[in-house]
Amino acid sequence: MINEQYEVAQYLEGKNVNKKCLHRICFLLAKYYKEKGMNHLEIRSEIFGWGRQYNIYFPFSVNSVIYQALEDKHPLRGETQVYISDSDVAQILARFDSKNCKILALAILCYAKVAANSDGEVAISTVAFANWLKMQQSHISGRYIPELIDFDFMEKLGDEETYFMWDKKTLSKNRRYKLKVPLVNEGTYVLSDNDIFTLASEVF
């Protein structure tokens, strides 16, 4: 989620591939091949070659995802230093008791420090966060995020953006949120290789 280059390297080796996250995975792979200078057809060929290698079927338009990746202006994030301070930890502990709420809040805070705009607004995919944090997506969207909102950690903005598979089943959902805690990338603790669990064990 934070280090997208590391994430892509894992996917290319067939690791941590969650079929519920295929839309995001395909998008990141398309960006990866775009940055290698490939054209539309070459990107498509590489993605389907990867899919055949790991027996993965794409239940959506890969070409549409390729267009999205080609239009995206942001390069894949590499090893970005994300710092957590004692003040950050205090903000979380002042609001939450449950382990999963604290981990989700920490993960969203880390993600927002590198992905939020100048107003502290960031788009969050509950499917992608569920895969990263090894939590049930329904628990994140139905229980944990409402608690984060109720206790003034963040606020919900606008409508949800939903992507569907060919059979109309939900593929992924994104919604924008505004963090209501300070977003200052400073502190003693560091997130490395997207390992939120090691970071959580250090700060909580």
Regions found by a protein language model. Name each.
Residues 169-204:
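Short, amphipathic alpha-helical interaction segments positioned at domain boundaries
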